C-alpha cells in the first residue's frame, strides 16, 4: 500500500535483499509505534530501553525486533490497552492497518519465558499488509528502579519525543542480560554485539542499576567484583561460533565479527568504565 510518509521512511534504508527489506519494515513500524505511544501519553509513565532503543536513538549497527518498556514506578493496575487506539491511529496515518493482542503467558514455552518476569506484560502488534511481521512489545510493570531517563527526538513519521533510559542504564540492562539470560540453551549473540558497542563508545556502566536488576530478577545481592567474575566466566566459556551465527542476520557488515573470540571479549570486559 502506497503512502508518502511510510515510503519516505523506508527510502532511508538499503532494500536490496529480502532480509534488508524485512529489517527496514520492522524498524519503520517500530518508529510508528513510538509515535502512537507518544500521542497517547505513554511516556509520561514509562521509558523505552534495550536493543531497539539503542538502534533507533544511538545508531547501533544492527537491527532489532522487539520493543521493551519499563514503567517509571511499580503499577500493578497498569493497563496498556488504553494505548492500543493511539498506536492504531498512528498506523492509519501512514496507510497501515494493525491489530494488537495481549499474549497469554500461560502458553509461553521455556524459550519465550526464560527471561520474562511475572510482572511483565507482553503484546503483539500484527500487520494486515505484512503478514509475516509481528512486533513484540514487553512492558515491565514492576521494574527494577534506580535508573535515569532522557527525552530523545524522532522526526518521522512526525516530530515527537520518546522517554528513554540513559546510556549508562541501557548498558546496565544489557550486561545483566548478557550474564544471566538463559536463551534456547545457548547465548544470544545480539547481547554480545551490543556489549562491544557500549565499550567502543566509552559508555560508563551504571552498576547501581545493574545491582538492582540482579536483586530483583535473580535474588542476588552482588558486588562489583562478583559481577566481574561472573562476566569473565560467561565470556571465556561461551561458544563463539554460536554467538556469531545468532547475530549474523541482524548486522550489515559480517566482517565486523571476524575478530570475535573469547579472549577478545574478555579483554573488552577489562575496558568497561564503571559510573
Language-model-detected regions and their locations in the chain:
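Glycine-rich beta-strand-to-loop/alpha-helix junction loops that act as flexible
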Residues: 49-52
Amino acid at each position: 500500500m502506497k503512502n508518502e510518509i511510510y515510503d519516505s521512511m523506508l527510502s532511508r534504508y538499503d532494500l536490496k535483499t529480502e532480509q534488508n527489506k524485512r529489517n527496514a519494515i520492522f524498524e519503520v513500524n517500530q518508529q510508528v509505534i513510538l509515535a502512537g505511544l507518544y500521542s497517547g501519553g505513554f511516556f509520561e509513565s514509562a521509558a523505552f530501553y534495550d536493543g531497539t532503543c539503542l538502534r533507533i536513538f544511538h545508531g547501533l549497527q544492527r537491527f532489532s525486533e522487539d520493543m521493551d518498556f519499563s514503567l517509571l514506578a511499580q503499577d500493578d493496575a497498569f493497563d496498556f490497552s488504553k494505548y492500543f487506539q493511539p498506536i492504531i491511529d498512528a498506523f492509519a496515518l501512514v496507510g497501515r492497518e494493525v491489530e494488537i493482542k495481549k499474549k497469554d503467558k500461560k502458553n509461553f514455552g521455556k524459550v519465550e519465558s526464560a527471561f520474562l518476569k511475572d510482572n511483565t506484560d507482553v503484546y503483539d502488534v500484527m500487520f494486515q499488509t505484512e503478514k509475516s511481521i509481528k512486533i513484540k512489545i514487553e512492558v515491565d510493570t514492576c521494574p527494577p528502579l534506580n535508573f535515569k531517563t532522557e527525552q530523545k527526538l524522532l522526526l518521522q513519521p512526525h516530530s515527537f519525543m520518546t522517554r528513554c533510559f540513559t546510556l549508562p542504564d541501557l548498558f546496565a540492562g544489557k550486561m545483566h542480560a548478557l550474564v544471566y539470560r538463559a536463551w534456547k540453551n545457548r547465548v544470544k549473540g545480539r547481547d554480545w554485539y551490543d556489549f562491544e558497542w557500549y565499550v567502543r563508545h566509552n559508555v560508563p556502566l551504571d552498576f547501581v542499576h545493574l545491582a538492582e536488576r540482579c536483586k530483583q530478577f535473580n535474588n542476588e545481592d552482588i558486588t562489583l567484583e562478583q559481577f566481574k567474575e561472573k562476566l569473565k566466566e560467561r565470556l571465556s566459556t561461551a561458544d563463539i561460533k554460536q554467538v556469531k551465527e545468532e547475530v549474523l542476520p541482524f548486522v550489515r557488515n559480517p566482517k565486523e565479527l571476524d575478530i570475535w573470540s573469547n579472549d577478545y571479549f574478555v579483554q573488552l570486559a577489562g575496558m568497561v568504565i564503571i559510573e
